[in-house]
A protein has these predicted regions:
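Conserved metal-phosphate-binding beta-hairpin within the catalytic cores
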Residues: 120, 200-218
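Arg/Gly-rich low-complexity intrinsically disordered repeat tracts
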Residues: 1-11, 15-24
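Phosphate-binding core of ATP-grasp and ATP-grasp-like enzymes
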Residues: 138, 143-155, 186-199, 221-226
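C-terminal helix-cap and adjacent tail motif
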Residues: 138, 220-261
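A short glycine-rich, hydrophobically flanked beta-strand micro-motif that places a catalytic Asp/Glu
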Residues: 96-104, 193-208
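A long amphipathic alpha-helix within ATP-dependent nucleotide-binding catalytic cores
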Residues: 169-201
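Active-site loop/lid in soluble adenylation, ligation, and acyl-transfer enzymes
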Residues: 29-149, 259
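Short histidine-centered catalytic/ligand-binding loop motif
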Residues: 65-75, 158-181
Length: 261
Protein backbone atom coordinates (compact mmCIF):
# COMPACT_ATOMS: atom_id res chain seq x y z
CA UNK A 1 0.00 0.00 0.00
CA UNK A 2 1.35 3.42 -0.96
CA UNK A 3 0.97 6.07 1.70
CA UNK A 4 3.20 8.87 0.42
CA UNK A 5 6.69 9.93 1.28
CA UNK A 6 8.51 9.63 4.58
CA UNK A 7 7.52 11.10 7.90
CA UNK A 8 6.73 14.78 7.73
CA UNK A 9 5.80 17.40 10.27
CA UNK A 10 4.90 21.03 9.92
CA UNK A 11 5.82 22.43 6.52
CA UNK A 12 7.81 25.61 6.18
CA UNK A 13 6.64 26.80 2.77
CA UNK A 14 4.44 29.87 2.31
CA UNK A 15 1.12 29.42 0.56
CA UNK A 16 1.61 32.75 -1.20
CA UNK A 17 4.97 31.53 -2.57
CA UNK A 18 3.71 28.15 -3.72
CA UNK A 19 3.44 27.64 -7.48
CA UNK A 20 0.18 25.76 -7.90
CA UNK A 21 0.83 23.06 -10.56
CA UNK A 22 -1.51 22.97 -13.53
CA UNK A 23 -1.71 20.30 -16.24
CA UNK A 24 -2.37 21.37 -19.81
CA UNK A 25 -5.44 19.71 -21.29
CA UNK A 26 -7.40 20.41 -24.44
CA UNK A 27 -10.64 20.02 -22.48
CA UNK A 28 -9.76 22.71 -19.92
CA UNK A 29 -11.94 25.50 -21.44
CA UNK A 30 -15.12 25.63 -19.40
CA UNK A 31 -18.52 25.24 -21.02
CA UNK A 32 -22.00 25.69 -19.59
CA UNK A 33 -22.40 25.79 -15.82
CA UNK A 34 -24.57 22.84 -14.80
CA UNK A 35 -24.40 23.01 -10.99
CA UNK A 36 -23.40 25.38 -8.21
CA UNK A 37 -23.27 24.37 -4.57
CA UNK A 38 -21.84 25.78 -1.36
CA UNK A 39 -18.21 24.96 -2.17
CA UNK A 40 -18.02 24.10 -5.87
CA UNK A 41 -19.22 24.84 -9.40
CA UNK A 42 -19.44 22.21 -12.16
CA UNK A 43 -19.00 23.06 -15.84
CA UNK A 44 -19.41 20.98 -18.97
CA UNK A 45 -16.44 20.31 -21.27
CA UNK A 46 -16.09 19.24 -24.90
CA UNK A 47 -16.35 15.63 -23.69
CA UNK A 48 -19.81 14.81 -22.27
CA UNK A 49 -18.23 12.25 -19.90
CA UNK A 50 -15.99 14.87 -18.24
CA UNK A 51 -16.62 18.01 -16.20
CA UNK A 52 -14.60 20.88 -14.76
CA UNK A 53 -14.97 21.09 -10.97
CA UNK A 54 -14.12 24.59 -9.72
CA UNK A 55 -13.51 25.23 -6.02
CA UNK A 56 -14.74 28.52 -4.58
CA UNK A 57 -12.83 31.02 -2.48
CA UNK A 58 -16.10 32.32 -1.04
CA UNK A 59 -18.74 29.66 -0.33
CA UNK A 60 -22.43 30.43 -0.02
CA UNK A 61 -24.14 29.80 3.32
CA UNK A 62 -27.71 28.58 3.11
CA UNK A 63 -27.88 29.71 -0.51
CA UNK A 64 -27.91 33.33 0.65
CA UNK A 65 -25.16 35.74 1.67
CA UNK A 66 -21.59 34.50 1.10
CA UNK A 67 -19.14 34.04 3.93
CA UNK A 68 -16.06 36.23 4.06
CA UNK A 69 -13.47 35.37 1.44
CA UNK A 70 -10.50 33.23 2.44
CA UNK A 71 -7.71 34.09 -0.04
CA UNK A 72 -6.64 31.10 -2.18
CA UNK A 73 -9.07 28.79 -0.41
CA UNK A 74 -10.17 27.36 -3.76
CA UNK A 75 -6.60 26.76 -4.89
CA UNK A 76 -5.69 25.02 -1.63
CA UNK A 77 -8.85 22.87 -1.74
CA UNK A 78 -8.01 21.90 -5.32
CA UNK A 79 -4.47 20.79 -4.50
CA UNK A 80 -5.36 18.99 -1.24
CA UNK A 81 -8.20 17.11 -2.94
CA UNK A 82 -6.02 16.23 -5.93
CA UNK A 83 -3.27 14.86 -3.67
CA UNK A 84 -5.71 12.65 -1.76
CA UNK A 85 -7.52 11.45 -4.89
CA UNK A 86 -4.18 10.49 -6.47
CA UNK A 87 -3.29 8.55 -3.33
CA UNK A 88 -6.58 6.65 -3.34
CA UNK A 89 -6.24 5.83 -7.04
CA UNK A 90 -2.67 4.56 -6.56
CA UNK A 91 -4.09 2.20 -3.95
CA UNK A 92 -6.80 0.82 -6.23
CA UNK A 93 -9.71 2.99 -5.10
CA UNK A 94 -11.39 4.59 -8.13
CA UNK A 95 -12.31 8.28 -7.97
CA UNK A 96 -13.72 10.85 -10.37
CA UNK A 97 -10.43 12.79 -10.45
CA UNK A 98 -8.60 13.04 -13.79
CA UNK A 99 -6.15 15.93 -13.43
CA UNK A 100 -5.67 19.51 -12.24
CA UNK A 101 -6.38 21.94 -15.10
CA UNK A 102 -6.43 25.32 -13.33
CA UNK A 103 -5.47 26.91 -10.04
CA UNK A 104 -8.98 26.21 -8.71
CA UNK A 105 -10.09 23.70 -11.34
CA UNK A 106 -9.84 19.94 -11.73
CA UNK A 107 -11.05 17.74 -14.56
CA UNK A 108 -13.38 15.04 -13.23
CA UNK A 109 -15.50 12.22 -14.59
CA UNK A 110 -19.21 12.96 -14.78
CA UNK A 111 -21.03 10.82 -12.22
CA UNK A 112 -24.62 10.12 -11.27
CA UNK A 113 -24.20 11.09 -7.63
CA UNK A 114 -25.80 9.08 -4.83
CA UNK A 115 -27.54 11.34 -2.32
CA UNK A 116 -25.57 10.06 0.65
CA UNK A 117 -22.78 11.43 2.79
CA UNK A 118 -20.73 8.50 4.05
CA UNK A 119 -18.89 9.40 7.26
CA UNK A 120 -16.12 7.26 8.76
CA UNK A 121 -15.19 8.06 12.37
CA UNK A 122 -11.96 6.97 14.06
CA UNK A 123 -12.21 9.28 17.09
CA UNK A 124 -15.30 10.51 18.96
CA UNK A 125 -16.00 14.12 18.01
CA UNK A 126 -18.70 16.36 16.59
CA UNK A 127 -22.23 14.99 16.37
CA UNK A 128 -21.22 11.45 17.36
CA UNK A 129 -19.80 12.58 20.71
CA UNK A 130 -22.83 14.77 21.36
CA UNK A 131 -25.40 12.19 20.28
CA UNK A 132 -23.91 9.31 22.30
CA UNK A 133 -22.57 11.28 25.26
CA UNK A 134 -18.97 10.27 24.53
CA UNK A 135 -15.96 12.29 25.58
CA UNK A 136 -14.51 14.21 22.65
CA UNK A 137 -11.16 12.73 21.67
CA UNK A 138 -11.94 9.14 22.67
CA UNK A 139 -10.31 6.73 20.23
CA UNK A 140 -13.02 4.37 19.05
CA UNK A 141 -12.33 0.63 19.47
CA UNK A 142 -13.27 0.18 15.80
CA UNK A 143 -14.10 2.73 13.10
CA UNK A 144 -17.76 3.78 12.99
CA UNK A 145 -19.50 4.15 9.61
CA UNK A 146 -22.52 6.43 9.25
CA UNK A 147 -24.85 7.42 6.41
CA UNK A 148 -26.48 10.84 6.09
CA UNK A 149 -29.23 11.71 3.60
CA UNK A 150 -28.20 14.69 1.46
CA UNK A 151 -31.32 16.81 1.90
CA UNK A 152 -31.14 20.47 2.90
CA UNK A 153 -34.90 20.49 3.51
CA UNK A 154 -34.60 17.65 6.05
CA UNK A 155 -31.32 18.76 7.61
CA UNK A 156 -29.24 15.83 6.28
CA UNK A 157 -30.67 13.21 8.69
CA UNK A 158 -28.75 10.17 9.89
CA UNK A 159 -29.87 6.98 8.12
CA UNK A 160 -29.35 3.27 8.55
CA UNK A 161 -29.05 0.85 5.63
CA UNK A 162 -32.76 0.00 5.75
CA UNK A 163 -33.59 3.70 5.31
CA UNK A 164 -31.15 3.93 2.39
CA UNK A 165 -32.85 1.05 0.61
CA UNK A 166 -36.37 2.30 1.49
CA UNK A 167 -35.55 5.67 -0.08
CA UNK A 168 -34.17 3.96 -3.17
CA UNK A 169 -30.81 5.70 -2.79
CA UNK A 170 -28.62 2.62 -3.28
CA UNK A 171 -29.01 -1.12 -3.71
CA UNK A 172 -27.76 -3.73 -1.24
CA UNK A 173 -24.84 -4.47 -3.58
CA UNK A 174 -23.94 -0.78 -3.83
CA UNK A 175 -24.10 -0.38 -0.05
CA UNK A 176 -21.76 -3.32 0.34
CA UNK A 177 -19.33 -1.75 -2.12
CA UNK A 178 -19.61 1.63 -0.40
CA UNK A 179 -18.84 0.08 3.01
CA UNK A 180 -15.85 -1.86 1.69
CA UNK A 181 -14.45 1.11 -0.23
CA UNK A 182 -14.82 3.48 2.72
CA UNK A 183 -12.99 1.14 5.10
CA UNK A 184 -10.27 0.59 2.48
CA UNK A 185 -9.92 4.35 2.07
CA UNK A 186 -9.56 4.71 5.83
CA UNK A 187 -6.74 2.16 5.77
CA UNK A 188 -4.94 4.25 3.15
CA UNK A 189 -5.60 7.68 4.64
CA UNK A 190 -4.72 6.97 8.29
CA UNK A 191 -0.99 6.26 7.67
CA UNK A 192 -0.75 8.97 4.98
CA UNK A 193 -1.88 11.66 7.42
CA UNK A 194 0.01 10.11 10.37
CA UNK A 195 3.24 10.57 8.39
CA UNK A 196 2.33 14.26 8.27
CA UNK A 197 1.66 14.41 12.03
CA UNK A 198 -2.10 14.59 11.47
CA UNK A 199 -4.79 12.55 13.24
CA UNK A 200 -7.73 11.78 10.95
CA UNK A 201 -10.58 11.91 13.45
CA UNK A 202 -13.25 11.49 10.78
CA UNK A 203 -13.91 12.14 7.10
CA UNK A 204 -16.73 12.21 4.57
CA UNK A 205 -16.93 10.45 1.22
CA UNK A 206 -19.52 10.78 -1.52
CA UNK A 207 -20.04 8.24 -4.28
CA UNK A 208 -21.39 8.30 -7.80
CA UNK A 209 -22.14 5.88 -10.61
CA UNK A 210 -20.45 5.74 -13.99
CA UNK A 211 -21.20 2.91 -16.42
CA UNK A 212 -22.22 0.57 -13.62
CA UNK A 213 -19.17 1.30 -11.46
CA UNK A 214 -19.04 3.19 -8.15
CA UNK A 215 -16.45 5.96 -7.87
CA UNK A 216 -15.52 8.31 -5.04
CA UNK A 217 -16.60 11.81 -6.05
CA UNK A 218 -16.96 15.31 -4.60
CA UNK A 219 -13.85 16.43 -2.64
CA UNK A 220 -11.55 15.51 0.24
CA UNK A 221 -10.57 18.73 2.02
CA UNK A 222 -10.63 20.27 5.52
CA UNK A 223 -14.30 21.13 4.92
CA UNK A 224 -15.26 17.46 5.00
CA UNK A 225 -12.57 16.00 7.26
CA UNK A 226 -11.80 16.49 10.93
CA UNK A 227 -8.01 16.87 11.20
CA UNK A 228 -6.13 17.19 14.51
CA UNK A 229 -2.46 17.75 15.15
CA UNK A 230 -1.07 14.35 16.16
CA UNK A 231 0.91 15.70 19.13
CA UNK A 232 -1.17 18.58 20.49
CA UNK A 233 -4.61 17.43 19.21
CA UNK A 234 -5.11 21.00 18.06
CA UNK A 235 -7.96 21.33 15.57
CA UNK A 236 -6.72 21.68 11.99
CA UNK A 237 -9.93 21.06 10.08
CA UNK A 238 -13.61 21.88 10.01
CA UNK A 239 -13.88 22.56 13.75
CA UNK A 240 -11.67 25.63 13.27
CA UNK A 241 -13.65 26.65 10.22
CA UNK A 242 -16.75 27.04 12.39
CA UNK A 243 -15.12 29.58 14.71
CA UNK A 244 -13.51 32.46 12.80
CA UNK A 245 -12.10 33.30 9.39
CA UNK A 246 -8.61 33.82 10.85
CA UNK A 247 -8.57 30.36 12.44
CA UNK A 248 -10.04 28.83 9.29
CA UNK A 249 -7.24 30.41 7.24
CA UNK A 250 -4.60 29.12 9.66
CA UNK A 251 -6.11 25.62 9.53
CA UNK A 252 -6.23 25.54 5.75
CA UNK A 253 -2.69 26.79 5.36
CA UNK A 254 -1.34 24.29 7.89
CA UNK A 255 -3.05 21.32 6.24
CA UNK A 256 -1.97 22.56 2.81
CA UNK A 257 1.67 22.85 3.91
CA UNK A 258 1.72 19.38 5.40
CA UNK A 259 0.01 17.67 2.47
CA UNK A 260 1.15 19.61 -0.59
CA UNK A 261 4.56 21.21 0.07
Amino acid sequence: METGRGKRGRGTGSVSDFQFPVSSNRLAPRGRKIYEGKWKILYETQDPALLIQRFKDTPMVGGAAPRAKLPRRGAMKNQISAAVFRLLQKNGIPTHFVEVVGERDMLVRRLEMIRLEVVLRNIAAGSLAKRLGMEVGTTLPAPVLEFYYKSDALGDPLLNEYHVRALGLASSEELRAIRETTFRANGVLLPFFAEREILLADFKLEFGRQKGALLVGDELTPDGCRFWDRTTRENLGKDWARRSLAREAAAYQEIFRRVCT
